[in-house]
Amino acid sequence: DQFALPNDFVLLVPGGAIHRPKKRWSTEKYSELARQFFVEGLVPILLGGISEAEILEEISINCPQAINLCGQTSLLQIATLARQARLSVGNDTGPMHLIAAVGRRTVVLYGNSSDPALCGQRGPHVTYLRKPNIKDITVESVKAVSIA
């Protein structure tokens, strides 16, 4: 394995289109989620492109145990990581479509800026969490569907 990752990890995909900030859950909440997963024995792996470096770095600072793979993964590597992960959590963004298709547990966060019925990720183990304002989705609600 190129990244030498631990056996038990969760993928976090906190980015999204720069021109659509309403599709992004807050870095503070991703940081808290990452810390909680780590306490439970799941190492958070952060995925995103170079344009999301600042977001991933902030989460890394707030959860130093997270492994930041910003800009280091190809689509094939993302699919491979998703297959190995216990769970993936992310915003409505391109990589989450690929991750969902792999077939592992996937939680995708939505506000009202897009509709999962029309453009949602598809796969056998996909859960959508949606609030009119994505910022109103709580860490607790993400955790609840993550362990269901």
Regions found by a protein language model. Give the residues of each.
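Nucleotide-sugar donor-binding patch of glycosyltransferase catalytic domains
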Residues: 61, 68-69, 97-148
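A nucleotide-sugar donor-handling region in carbohydrate enzymes
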Residues: 1-9, 20, 137
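Short glycine-rich anion-binding loops that position phosphate/pyrophosphate groups of nucleotides
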Residues: 15-18, 94-95
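Charged active-site motifs of nucleotide-sugar-dependent glycosyltransferases
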Residues: 3-13, 42-45
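Donor-binding and catalytic core of enzymes assembling or modifying cell-surface/extracellular glycoconjugates
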Residues: 27-107, 111-114
